[in-house]
UniProtKB/Swiss-Prot annotation:
Subcellular localization, as worded in the UniProt entry: Cell projection, Cilium, Flagellum; Cytoplasm, Cytoskeleton, Flagellum axoneme; Cytoplasm, Cytoskeleton, Cilium axoneme
Protein name, UniProt field: Cilia- and flagella-associated protein 43
Coiled-coil region list: 926-960, 1171-1223
SUPFAM superfamilies the UniProt entry points to: WD40 repeat-like, YVTN repeat-like/Quinoprotein amine dehydrogenase
Species assigned in the record: Mus musculus (Mouse)
Length: 1682
């Protein structure tokens, strides 16, 4: 590796060394070998930049590629430290800056075209730079970094120093640019914000000043946001306290309070995408929403440009969403995702849109060349176009990017001229190896995965994702053709490789099949068969040497479950194409094992790559988890099964990440690549590295693949993610190494050339026949359409994979063999189908319960099992869903029950009346926690202590007051007792001051603080705790009353139930149809019923498991047996009772109503047939019936009376309960009212506490903000002090330079005093003469094209101007310009003096410009200091106002007052907002006063009405009189006007002219033209005035500098005057006026003389000093130290 300090990190050209020297332990055979970069192919993923007018550059991988637009020649600059990060160019200085992407990245500055490193910029950035930007003027470079710093830094790239930097946390910038007109302004934009940065300089100090741009809303309107820090529009609320900003309400006290916005107040803004600068230092900004903005960078005013006319967009096209903008004269060019470049012509605040160019894909970048003759256009794919203005063919395609990422590369045999590249989208390109130019392309229109070129024929094979292998004819590299395609399987093709002699093509798929195909196109790429291996094949390695008759194949695939890798080794005989297919593969295309001789090996660790050595049966493997390369020796003996290989040799790879190992064409080199991006070439025997080259980096995930040509002279390396292809060549290669590879490649190339020639002839003939067939097909398609079905059939046949075709052929063969047996099975199936059909018909006729499903008749056991499994899965899924739903509902039930039932000490329930619709609810209550009880006891103890302290204080005061009067001790004791009673009374406040009726419920309010005394936070919190205790006690007291009423209702219901038993008996005895009224508790009265589910509430039948059904059946049968036995016993008892006693054990009184006297049997006969005895018996029977009826009536009346009595008692008891519950309801309403009153007090106190917290938050924020501003004030004061000191020092240097310049001017004649006077005058004229510095004139067309015109120069240009000035001085110093008669030595002395004078003047000019800049810097720092000071004063005023409001809030308390019934508040409460003078008085007094006032007011109104009528009549008469006078005046005036009527010429013209409107229109047109001319003249005058104002501004600045100088001089004069005044004051007035005047006169004369003498001496001294200096300079070389 190069050790040059200028090239320690970056290699500066394509021919620079890209490799390191061999290790010390390597063989001397390979010493001195190294690789270098030949060329690099990559397409831009970042923006392309111009380095000069004819060269562009862009980064690609580890390289920066430069392209000359005229010659198309490429130059490469390599970054050894890894992938190139961001890049920028500076056209005036022709330098390139780019960063790397390592930890703590570095920025490199390179000059072009020498590509030498000028500087290396090291900052404090940890991760990555995201943006770089050069200023057009000056040596400034801006860099921006992302996470974690978000830092903008300004560099002096020539001095490698950071001038200033500033961090912006969270600001992710997408574009950064300098103002092209000056380096003082920058613009940073992201998708959500824009900011303008101003760089201010004071000598060597630089300072950033940031200003954010307020973007419009998404609809292009502007939002006026109020000041959230110090709002001035907040409403005033005199009742509820001060209204504070939202940040204080949110409780924010830090920096977040400054930018806090509620979610509802945040509106979506426009999203900038790109911006560009104008010559007037304005900004054009494009937005995602399609709007175009113009921003004035001085005022930050945003203008939304409007379309002058609607631009028609294509159908379905989106809005013009510019991805990039570039400025041109009178407008901009913009491009978007639609691939169209639009030209915007902007005038004032409107623009017109025109289509400039159209492309297929989105255009991502536009940039003009420095001369603005060319426009560079870059697409999203990486293609680059150059549009040359004024050319015949303006659009030129410079870079044609590939369609997708490069997947693979392969040399076209022998690998000395061309190679192929394959992209992921299926694009195959033929590229020249000499200059990397693309010769041809072919699109396969499918996703491709692998590529390989055949060594034995001019063909290539491409593997695709859909399982195809396409064969390409590359005999003619300018027009490749697809000649064959093989659909192997539906699995994607992963690896395609040829053996070294090009006999076989091996294709590996993802599913683990390796297909063996004949590589010769003359054999139509015959597929020999496939062999099965493991999935995810990593690599297929082959060994095919000329001396061998077999091709050895090694396949590597992983065993992830075992953490190992498996190797499969098999051989393919060279004579395989001549063998009959049945001998090497079976019917399904699988290669036979006895032909391939397959062996399995395993290694104990995972390998990412493995290759097979040419000799010694060696395997070389690259370990994936450890950095080692191992070699394994395959045993000579045959084996079966899997053999574990042990490492034979192990070498540390010194490469990190998984890699791939390759074998050179002669088999002596091992080439390894890895994720680190380093290519290592090793000796096969020692496995030591002798060449190491870093072409890619780990940031781009290293190298994907590499290829070496047959002669070993060229190596292609393809990156994985950086899309960069690098061609390496040998920079130094030993003669022995070259001879080795030449000796191997020559016979191989000779052998292959014979096969290539024969196959080329076949391909050429097949190409001609294919062309003829295509022509015939084209003609036939015009006439015949009947063959389309046959072509589609062929295509359909081709869509079947080869492996499936083989499978189908094998199946067809098996079908032919087993066809008789098949027919028998089909016959049996048909008979079985008929039987099943009959069974299904019978099934349709049975009942629904007995009917079977159609699935039950399916005889397919697998199908039945599948359906059964599906049903089981569905049932299990439903069961799981139901269980989860039930579990969720159960969990929710438990939560609700725990929260609303279990946690309640008093459950909520209702109580209803029996007869009236009154419902009384109790108060549900939770048990107070231990913490609440402790707080309550603490507060109560504190309040009791305070009361006791108050009593003791009063006692102490009273004792002290009565110590002087000892005689009245007894009276004092009585007074003390009265005071105690008074204290006890005053502790309980009256209800109207207490604010509630809580005392009516027995609440103890003696501990409550008066509402007029609640000031401190602690008192308010204690008051809340006490009020909550009062509410709790009120609820508890009411609940006790409710519980008593509830128990009473239970008793009443029980009593009614007892009485209803007797009532039911009476009703049944009386056989009445009345219903018994039975009161019951409802669900609201018994809420616990909701937690219990009764059986009658369940509508679904309960599911009983089979094992439970048997158990239930046993229990039911046992119960039925017992019931039958009990019924049998009861039946026997009943029959015995009926037989013995007629069914009655005891005759009761209730039985009278049911008693019936049986009729004698003779009553069935007629009366005439009765006997006397029978008649007597009938009389006795009638008597008994009469007596029974009388007894029955008496008993019925007694029952009715008893029934009425019971009903009345029930009605009375329930009515009494209803009355009691009615009173309880009123009590409930009152209790709720009292609770609401107490809760209202609590809410008021909580509101006051919340407002107090808001005030404290606001105060804390203001204090923090004040501290922040004070720190800013300190910093600005320090900056002012430092700037002032620097200005004073610099001004002193400037004054010294000015003084030296004046001395040089004044001492000129004395310098040349020894020559003649006229010669001195001539020389002085020449001394004042200055050369004209000719500016480099640009061409007129270039000046007209460049929109920015001539821009101010940089420091480099200033140095060039000085050099040019000195060069012009050489012309003036020519001897030909010497006056006649002048000594040449004098002329030389004159020239040196004049040159010194010119240099000094240039220095003075530079110093004056720097002095003006420093003065401006100081003025801006003072302005910033004034702004900060104003903000500090504002904060102080806000703090004072806030403290006043806080005090006012603490004093003005919200008091809750009870009003009597009938007293209401005023609706318009704003009538009286100040209650400082208000008092509470009795309502009756006010009503009496109002009645008196009302009576007196009525009397006054009556008298006023009477006087009003009189005044109204007087006013009416006066009004009529005035009206008549005015009408008279109007008539007189009208008569006079008629007499003096003026009839002008215009009126005459109007009457005489028939087309008066046309005349007026002509006059209006003339006036409009006049107005337009006046308007143009006015605009010109305005422009002239603006120019004049600019000149006056510059003149004013000059005058300011002069005034500043004069003010400094005036300050010195004032000091001198003050000193003289002090001296005069010390002398005093001791002498007389005459003497004093005389002395003054003498002193003035002496002073005048002394001044004259001092001036003369000063002039002489200055002359002598100049002479001494001249002599010293003249004789300095000859001076000898004493």
């Amino acid at each position: 590796m190069s050790q040059d300090p200028e090239r320690d990190d970056v290699t500066a050209s394509a021919t620079a060394s890209a490799s390191a020297s061999a290790p010390a332990s390597a063989s001397a055979h390979y010493s001195g070998s190294s690789l270098s970069v030949r060329w690099v192919q990559g397409f831009p993923s970042q923006n392309v930049h111009f380095v000069n007018d004819q060269t562009i550059c862009y980064p690609s991988g580890n390289f920066v590629i430069f392209i000359n637009l005229e010659t198309k020649k490429k130059t490469v600059l390599q970054c050894i430290n890894g992938i190139v990060g961001v890049m920028a160019t500076n056209v005036p200085s022709e330098v390139v800056a780019f960063s790397d992407r390592r930890f703590k990245p570095v920025i490199y500055i390179y000059s072009f075209p020498s590509l030498t490193r000028k500087n290396k910029l090291k900052g404090d950035i940890l991760l990555d730079y995201t943006l770089l930007c050069f200023s057009y003027c000056g040596t400034y470079l801006a860099s921006y970094s992302s996470l974690p710093e978000f830092e903008l830094a300004l560099w002096n790239w020539e001095a490698s120093a950071i001038l200033c930097k500033k961090s912006n946390p969270g600001m992710d910038v997408s574009q950064m640019s300098f103002n092209p007109m000056n380096w003082h302004q920058m613009c940073l934009s992201s998708s959500s914000a824009m900011s303008v940065w101003t760089i201010e300089r004071s000598n060597q100090e630089h300072h950033f000043r940031i200003r954010s741009v307020k973007l419009p809303l998404e609809d292009a309107t502007f939002l006026n946001e109020p000041d959230m820090l110090f709002p001035t529009t907040l409403p005033k609320d005199l009742i509820y306290g001060p209204v504070l900003p939202l940040s204080a309400i949110a409780g924010l006290v830090g920096e977040e309070a400054e930018t806090f916005r509620p979610k509802d107040d945040i509106y979506p803004l426009l999203h900038p995408t790109m911006h560009c600068w104008t010559p007037s230092s304005d900004l054009y900004v494009g937005c995602e929403e399609g709007h175009l903005l113009m921003i004035n960078t001085e005022t930050l005013k945003v203008t939304v440009l409007q379309k002058a006319e609607e631009f028609p967009l294509p159908d379905g096209a989106p809005l013009i969403n510019p991805l990039t903008l570039v400025y041109q004269k009178d407008g901009i060019l913009a491009s978007g995702i639609d691939g169209v470049i639009y030209s915007f012509i902007i005038k004032d605040s409107k623009y017109q849109v025109k289509t400039f160019l159209e492309f297929d894909g989105p255009v991502t970048h536009l940039v003009f060349s420095p001369s603005y003759k060319m426009l560079l256009i870059q697409t999203d794919k990486g293609s680059v176009y150059i549009y040359t203005f004024g050319a015949e063919m303006p659009l030129d395609k410079l870079l044609d990017a590939c369609d997708g990422k490069v997947q693979a590369v392969s040399f076209i045999t022998p690998g000395t001229k061309y190679f192929l590249t394959l992209t992921s989208s299926g694009e195959v390109s033929t590229v020249s190896l000499e200059d990397c130019n693309c010769t041809s392309r072919i699109f396969l229109k499918t996703q491709a995965t692998a590529l390989a070129c055949s060594p034995s024929s001019p063909t290539a094979a491409v593997g695709t994702v859909d399982g195809y292998v396409y064969f390409l004819n590359i005999l003619d590299v300018e027009s490749p053709q697809m000649i064959h395609q093989a659909f192997l399987s539906q699995s994607p093709v992963k690896i395609v490789t040829y053996d070294q002699r090009g006999i076989f093509l091996l294709v590996g798929t993802e599913e683990g099949n390796i297909f063996v195909i004949d590589a010769r196109p003359s054999k139509s790429f015959q597929i020999f068969g496939f062999t099965e291996t493991g999935k995810d094949i990593l690599q297929i390695s082959t060994v095919s040497v000329m001396e061998s008759d077999v091709v050895e194949v090694l396949v590597l695939y992983p065993l992830p479950d075992m953490g190992r890798s498996r190797l499969e080794y098999f051989t393919l005989p060279v004579m395989l194409p001549e063998v009959v297919p049945e001998n090497f593969s079976d019917e399904r295309g699988r290669l036979k094992d006895d032909l391939t001789h397959k062996y399995l090996y395993e290694v104990e660790h995972t390998l990412s790559s493995a290759v097979l050595g040419f000799t010694g049966s060696k395997i070389f493997g690259f370990c994936s988890q450890v950095p080692y390369i191992c070699s394994y020796v395959m045993p000579v003996k045959e084996h079966t099964g899997v053999l574990v290989l042990k490492p034979h040799q192990k070498v540390q790879s010194k490469q990190y990440g998984s890699g791939t190992i390759y074998l050179s064409s002669h088999g002596l080199w091992l080439m390894t690549i890895a994720k680190c991006g380093i290519l290592c070439i090793r000796d096969m025997f020692s496995m030591e590295t002798f060449v190491r080259c870093r072409s890619h980096s780990h940031q781009g995930r290293g190298i994907q693949n590499m290829k070496m040509s047959l002669d070993g002279q060229h190596i292609l390396v393809n990156g994985k993610d950086d899309n960069t292809l690098v061609c390496l060549k040998w920079k130094r290669l030993g003669a022995n190494i070259a001879s080795e590879i030449f000796e191997h490649s020559r016979p191989l190339v000779l052998h292959l050339s014979q096969t290539v020639e024969s196959e080329s002839v076949y391909l050429a003939l097949s190409r001609e026949s294919t062309n003829e067939q295509q022509e015939e097909t084209t003609e036939s398609q015009k006439h015949l359409n009947s063959d389309s079905s046959e072509e589609e059939a062929v295509i359909d046949h081709k869509m079947i994979p080869w492996i499936q075709q083989k499978m189908e052929e094998a199946i067809k063969k098996e079908v032919r063999i087993f066809s008789p047996r098949r027919k028998e099975i089909k016959r049996g199936i048909k008979e079985l189908a008929q039987v099943i059909a009959m069974m299904m018909e019978e099934n349709e006729k049975v009942d629904i319960i007995a009917k079977l499903d159609e699935q039950e008749f399916c005889l397919d056991a697998d199908e039945l099992e599948r359906l059964h499994d599906e049903c089981e899965e569905e049932v299990a899924k439903i069961r799981k869903d139901v269980e989860m739903h039930n579990l969720a509902q159960s969990y929710l039930t438990e939560l609700i029950k725990e929260e609303c039932w279990n946690s309640m000490a008093v459950k909520g329930r209702a109580l209803k009346c029996f007869h009236i619709p009154y419902v009384v609810d109790n108060f549900p209550m939770k048990e107070r926690t231990e913490e609440e009880l402790q707080e309550l006891s603490k507060v109560m103890q504190q309040k009791k202590t305070e009361i006791e302290c108050l009593k003791l204080r009063k006692e102490i005061v009273e004792v002290q007051a009565t110590t002087t009067i000892a005689k009245k001790h007894h009276e004092e004791e009585e007074e003390e007792e009265e005071d105690e009673e008074r204290t006890i009374k005053t502790t309980s406040l009256p209800n109207y001051l207490l604010g509630s009726l809580s005392t009516d419920f027995g609440a103890d309010t003696s501990l409550l603080t008066s509402q007029l005394d609640l000031h401190s936070r602690e008192e308010k919190i204690n008051q809340i705790i006490l009020l909550k205790d009062i509410i709790y006690n009120i609820k508890r007291n009411f609940n006790s009353e409710f519980d008593a009423a509830y128990k009473q209702k239970e008793i009443e219901i029980a009593r009614v139930k007892e009485k209803n038993v007797r009532i039911a008996e009476i009703i049944s005895d009386l056989e009445l149809e009345e219903t018994v009224w039975q009161p019951v508790f409802e669900d609201s009265e018994k809420p616990e019923r909701a937690l219990v589910v009764e059986d009658d509430e369940i509508s679904f039948k309960k599911y009983i498991a089979p094992w439970q059904r048997a158990k239930i059946k046993e229990v039911v049968s046992t119960y039925e047996m017992e019931r039958l036995q009990q019924a049998r016993i009861s039946d026997e008892r009943q029959r015995g009772l009926m037989d013995m006693m007629g069914g009655v054990l005891e005759v009761k009184k209730e039985d009278i109503l049911r008693m019936v006297i049986p009729q004698p049997p003779f009553m069935a006969k007629a009366d005439a047939l009765w006997s006397e005895d029978e008649r007597k018996q009938f009389k006795e029977y009638e008597k008994k019936v009469k007596e029974l009826n009388e007894e029955r009536d008496k008993y019925r009346k007694s029952l009715e009376a008893e029934l009425k009595k019971l009903q009345n008692s029930i009605q009375e008891s329930t009515q009494n309960f209803d009355d009691h519950l009615k009173r309880l309801f009123e009590r409930r309403v009152k209790a709720e009212m009292v609770i609401n009153q107490e809760e209202l007090k609590i809410n008021n106190i909580i509101f006051s506490l919340l407002l107090d917290e808001e005030l404290s938050s606001r105060e804390q924020f203001l204090n923090n903000y004040l501290l922040k501003k004070q720190e800013e004030k300190t910093k600005t004061a320090e900056a002012i002090q430092k700037a002032r000191e620097d200005l004073d020092v610099f001004k002193e240097h400037h004054d010294m330079l000015v003084a030296e310049d004046k001395i040089l001017d004044r001492s000129f004649k004395k310098e040349f005093s020894d020559i003649l006077g006229h010669q001195v005058d001539v020389l002085y004229k020449l001394f004042k003469r200055r050369p004209r510095v000719h500016k480099q004139k640009t061409q007129a067309d270039v000046t007209s094209l460049v929109p920015y015109g001539e821009r101010p120069g940089s420091a480099k240009l200033n140095k060039e101007n000085l050099a040019q000035l000195m060069k012009s001085m050489d012309e003036l110093d020519n001897i030909n310009n010497m006056p006649e008669g002048l000594d040449p030595s004098v002329w030389e002395h004159f020239c040196s003096t004049r040159r010194a004078k010119v240099e000094n003047e240039y220095k003075v000019k530079q110093k004056a410009a720097c002095l003006l800049e420093m003065t401006t810097f100081l003025r801006k720092r003072m302005e910033e200091d004034d702004v900060v000071h104003h903000e500090i004063e504002k904060v102080f005023h806000e703090l004072i106002r806030l403290q006043d409001e806080k005090v006012r809030f603490q004093v003005n308390l919200t008091v809750q007052i009870l009003l009597k019934q009938g007293q209401v508040e005023l609706e318009n409460f704003q009538l009286m907002l100040e209650y400082s003078d208000a008092i509470l008085i009795n309502k009756n007094i006010i009503e009496d006063l109002n009645s008196v006032i009302r009576t007196q007011g009525q009397k006054k109104v009556a008298s006023m009405m009477e006087s009003k009528e009189v005044h109204k009549g007087i006013y009416q008469i006066e009004w009529e009189h005035k009206k008549m006078e005015m009408e008279m005046e109007d008539l007189n005036q009208r008569a006079w006007d008629i007499e003096m009527l003026f009839f002008s010429r215009d009126r005459q013209k109007y009457l005489n002219e028939p087309n008066y409107e046309n005349v007026i229109a002509i006059q209006i047109g003339i006036m409009e033209q006049t107005i337009s001319v006046i308007d143009k003249t006015h605009k010109k005058n305005v422009e002239n005035c603006k120019k004049l104002l600019k000149k006056l501004g510059k003149y004013s600045n000059q005058k300011d500098v002069a005034n500043y100088t004069l003010s400094c001089n005036l300050r010195e004069e004032l000091v001198a005057v003050s000193e003289r005044q002090d001296i005069c004051n010390e002398i005093g007035s001791k002498l007389t006026c005459e003497k004093i005047a005389r002395e003054r006169y003498d002193n003035q004369l002496k002073q005048q003389k002394l001044l004259n003498i001092s001036k003369q001496q000063a002039e002489q001294i200055s002359i002598l000093q100049a002479e001494v200096e001249r002599l010293r300079m003249k004789t300095f070389p000859a001076l000898i130290p004493m």
